[in-house]
Amino acid sequence: MQVLVRDNNVDQALKALKKKMQREGIFREMKLRGHYEKPSEKKAREKAEAVRRARKLARKKMQREGLLPMKPKPVFGAGPGAGRGGPGAGARPPR
């Protein structure tokens, strides 16, 4: 795999390389090959992945047909933990 380094901009080239590797699935493959996986474990993992893919496709199809509500788009600042962590939040009373 190759990337061009333009104007000695190594950071940009590294970013492009990482993007290519991510798209090709190299990081995932490295993680899987990091240790031996028994054939039975491989079979179970692949089956679980297939089930996950099938469920995701079915969910998307139902959403397109209007049987399920569409996933709401996240509103920044109103997610989990909103309203917590402001000034004085978690302050303990004096002893």
Swiss-Prot record:
Residues covered by region (Disordered): 55-95
Keyword Ribonucleoprotein carried by entry: yes
Coiled coil: none
Pfam families in the cross-refs: Ribosomal_S21
GO biological process: translation
Gene3D superfamilies noted in UniProt: Ribosomal protein S8
Cross-referenced InterPro entries: Ribosomal_bS21, Ribosomal_bS21_CS, Ribosomal_bS21_sf
Keywords: Ribonucleoprotein, Ribosomal protein
Gly residues compositional bias, start-end: 78-89
Keyword Kinase (UniProt): no
UniProt GO molecular function: structural constituent of ribosome
GO cellular-component term (any): ribosome
Similarity-based family: Belongs to the bacterial ribosomal protein bS21 family.
Record-given protein name: Small ribosomal subunit protein bS21
Organism: Nitrobacter hamburgensis (strain DSM 10229 / NCIMB 13809 / X14)
